[in-house]
């Protein structure tokens, strides 16, 4: 089997969003390329199914990509956008893979506003330790959770957590301010899309340089891994999808008949005329009453 080179940060390379409102753009962007194919990576998280289609190379990663990786540091805004895209995908996958209807969607505030993000993180981690001590006494494993510390007028904590303890038990272990716990559920035939979007919405914050805005429990969450197929879609099929975006949903539903198409985004790079396609689909067979195993 011929070796294929597709191990690179394609989201960094294909960073311009494609707008097909005019045909002139495609004429400027598309360039014929030899030695190029497309890898299809799929990621299943709960009832969500992501499809990522990106260029692979039959000989080696082109010099232009290596130079792009080695060139001077990206602008702060470009790097922030890339980091945000990676973070959103990881959070999306963790939540959909590890949480179920009946789990908890929580908001906690601080009566005494922490002086900085680092202090807030320490207080939150102490809260998780208190939760786990109660669970241990009950013979339960450590809590599963994904959280984000957010600043609007004041710092506060948003949290998705499993329902091993009652809402009253969880609230009693916060003790630092107001608490509001809702039962996690689906909304309008989606899974937890709204929760993910809310947690990762754009907002001014006081993140320290290099710090994540969100975190999760350690050692008990499953992060779905991509499954690669290097022959699923030919270059011709990919270009047809780019040129006929209205047909992408129908085409993907033929390729993956157990899923309904939901949304797509196409990005490109203007120096090599190649494309990256991201699509989200949702299982047709997902049972709303499905509970934690």
PLM regions and their residue ranges:
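Right-hand nucleic-acid polymerase module
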Residues: 1-153, 163-293
């Amino acid at each position: 089997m011929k070796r294929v080179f597709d191990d690179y940060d394609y989201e960094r390379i294909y960073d311009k969003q494609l707008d097909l409102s005019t045909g002139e753009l495609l004429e400027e962007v598309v360039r014929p390329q030899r030695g190029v194919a497309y890898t299809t990576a799929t990621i299943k998280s709960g009832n969500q199914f992501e499809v990522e289609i990106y260029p692979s190379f039959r000989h080696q990663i082109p010099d232009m990509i290596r130079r792009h990786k080695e060139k001077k540091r990206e602008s702060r805004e470009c790097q922030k956008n890339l980091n945000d895209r990676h973070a959103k995908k990881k959070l999306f996958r963790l939540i959909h893979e590890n949480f179920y209807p009946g789990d908890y969607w929580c908001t906690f505030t601080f009566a005494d506003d922490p002086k900085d993000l680092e202090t807030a993180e320490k207080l939150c981690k102490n809260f998780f330790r208190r939760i786990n001590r109660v669970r241990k006494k009950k013979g339960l494993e450590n809590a599963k959770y994904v959280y984000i510390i957010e600043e609007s007028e004041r710092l506060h904590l948003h949290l998705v957590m499993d329902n091993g303890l009652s809402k009253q038990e969880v609230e009693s272990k916060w003790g630092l301010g107001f608490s509001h716990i809702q039962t996690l559920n689906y909304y309008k035939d989606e899974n937890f899309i709204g929760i993910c979007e809310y947690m990762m919405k754009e907002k001014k914050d006081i993140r320290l340089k290099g710090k994540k805005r969100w975190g999760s429990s350690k050692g008990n969450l499953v992060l779905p891994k991509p499954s690669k197929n290097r022959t699923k879609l030919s270059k011709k099929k990919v270009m047809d999808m780019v040129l006929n975006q209205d047909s992408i949903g129908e085409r993907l539903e033929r390729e993956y008949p157990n899923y309904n198409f939901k949304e797509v985004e196409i990005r490109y790079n203007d120096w090599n005329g190649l494309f990256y396609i991201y699509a989200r689909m949702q299982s047709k067979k997902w049972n709303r009453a499905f509970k934690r195993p």
